[in-house]
Amino acid sequence: MGEREELVETLDKHRGLLRRTARDLTDEQAARRTTASELCLGGLIKHVAAVEARWARFITGGAAAMRGGQDGEWAEQFRMAEGETLAGLLAGYEAVARGTDELVRSLPDLDLAHPLPSAPWFEPGVSWSARRVLLHLIAETAQHAGHADIIREALDGAKSMG
């Protein structure tokens, strides 16, 4: 297995861990906050899907392609909105994942890079390659899968990763 497939496989493993935290839940349970945090399981899935989609756009179009999903919309990424369902959020996440995987497999080179957008959390003048973006997505997804596991355990005692 080559580097590209290893990265896709690792990202997909962590996606699966995140999805597993939502197994057998109702929409109401997926929308419920169970800790002092604002986070809920449905909102985490929604957020991770949005972040992955934005970074996939970065890979192909650079920082300008990442616009959207900022400011007021940012906080809403962590909540299930009226009318959203867990099944719908999971289907949306699956579609984003398929798109990212297809993109990665189609890239001529993982060294394709773009300058990062201007933001307080990015060092000025730094560029990220497609490879670096994938590493970031793996870390982001794994971190949020851990958050989701805590939320799920607080919800009904179920553990998805332990």
What is each residue range found by the language model?
Residues 76-115, 131-138, 142:
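Acidic/histidine-rich alpha-helical segments that form the ligand environment
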